[in-house]
Amino acid sequence: MAKTYSAGVKEYRETYWMPNYTPKDTDILACFKITPQAGVPREEAAAAVAAESSTGTWTTVWTDLLTDLDYYKGRAYAIEDVPGDDTCFYAFIAYPIDLFEEGSVVNVFTSLVGNVFGFKAVRALRLEDVRFPIAYVMTCNGPPHGIQVERDIMNKYGRPMLGCTIKPKLGLSAKNYGRAVYECLRGGLDFTKDDENVNSQPFMRWRQRFDFVMDAIDKAERETGERKGHYLNVTAPTPEEMYKRAEYAKEIGAPIIMHDYITGGFCANTGLAQWCRDNGVLLHIHRAMHAVLDRNPHHGIHFRVLTKILRLSGGDHLHTGTVVGKLEGDRASTLGWIDLLRESYIKEDRSRGLFFDQDWGSMPGAFAVASGGIHVWHMPALVTIFGDDSVLQFGGGTLGHPWGNAAGACANRVALEACVEARNQGVAIEKEGKDVLTKAAASSPELKIAMETWKEIKFEFDTVDKLDIAHK
């Protein structure tokens, strides 16, 4: 029988709540944490989110008859309690893949975290996880190069890489900035880095910074015989300016550039990743602004989702937190999104906050970057937590060394190599780390001084965004 139009307002659950639906392999699946308004039933709130993030609007419209609404609509198919919190619940929603433009994380986010987050039917809403089917993953280019290609480019194997963010982050002249880069690379680091807010300010224009940094890299490479790099931040006011800076970095021989993927935008990031792939340049990604989106446990976007989006959009490195440093990061959750960044197939694991299986197919992984308030005493834990496919970045933990930048870099290199050697010999370095470092410091005065300088420095603040109680 032909469908007929009936004007008016219906409850969302009449159309979008489908508890008997079995998700398809090609569906994009989302888990939302919903805090409904008082008096709104869970099924109605879940259906409202499914509607507003897919095909629905506040009233029936006659143009629904011009399409197959039953095919295109999002479907709220399951509800679960949030352990330890009866003010909210988990809603699982399935979206047909045809709702989204191929290869466009911009389009995915416009639907999943668009107008629905201002919806009056809910008091708070958080996107906890997304399952991207392999059919969608294959439409995205992902990391420009990936872990193995980067190791081959940099000729570094069998250990984490070492980095350092140049400090003070703002105010240095280009010449003094280049001097700091040289000292750190000459001292033993693999990479140095622009801070996320270093772009092209009056005290240091981008072109002068790029030139002095490349002079520093070339000199450090000649003296050490090792490949070196510096993350030249090409984030800019416009895409045109961003590509202009990227082209110049390539022209002068820079092996790696950098982008602030959230503040710079997903469209810009996807385009830059494609440029890096085409031009043989590595891409470091900073997550500036992520905590605005992911730190509130009831509203926003969980960082595991931002990790997945970055892997689809493209980047060879991503800052992931440190667990042990100054920045937010629960250990189990952090290990979960590190796997999402690096591994090919990740199983659902609620103990690590992973709500879905995720298959990346042959898409390469990216390096996890640990950065923020770390020093040599953290090295055993960092090597244990992050493993070899990571970049451990010590900013103040390098530049704050009493003997200067080169000594700070040397201390970190000695500590890293001691921990990797001990680990390879079967030592439980996270437990025996003090002994490992003390032994190494006996033949490294730089490490000994670093250990004395930072032995009392800890960041023992409770994590705000924890895993829900019963998931641990």
UniProtKB/Swiss-Prot annotation:
EC numbers, comma separated: 4.1.1.39
Binding site for Mg(2+): 193, 195-196
Active site, UniProt feature: 167, 286
Function: RuBisCO catalyzes two reactions: the carboxylation of D-ribulose 1,5-bisphosphate, the primary event in carbon dioxide fixation, as well as the oxidative fragmentation of the pentose substrate. Both reactions occur simultaneously and in competition at the same active site.
Species this chain originates from: Allochromatium vinosum (strain ATCC 17899 / DSM 180 / NBRC 103801 / NCIMB 10441 / D) (Chromatium vinosum)
Cofactor(s) needed: Mg(2+)
Induction trigger: Expressed when grown photoautotrophically (at protein level).
Lineage of the species this protein comes from: Bacteria, Pseudomonadati, Pseudomonadota, Gammaproteobacteria, Chromatiales
Keyword set, alphabetical order: Calvin cycle, Carbon dioxide fixation, Lyase, Magnesium, Metal-binding, Monooxygenase, Oxidoreductase, Photosynthesis
Positions with a binding annotation for substrate: 115, 165, 169, 287, 319, 371
More about this protein: The basic functional RuBisCO is composed of a large chain homodimer in a 'head-to-tail' conformation. In form I RuBisCO this homodimer is arranged in a barrel-like tetramer with the small subunits forming a tetrameric 'cap' on each end of the 'barrel'.
Reaction(s) catalysed by this chain's protein: 2 (2R)-3-phosphoglycerate + 2 H(+) = D-ribulose 1,5-bisphosphate + CO2 + H2O; D-ribulose 1,5-bisphosphate + O2 = 2-phosphoglycolate + (2R)-3-phosphoglycerate + 2 H(+)
Swiss-Prot/TrEMBL site (Transition state stabilizer) positions: 326
Full protein name: Ribulose bisphosphate carboxylase large chain 1
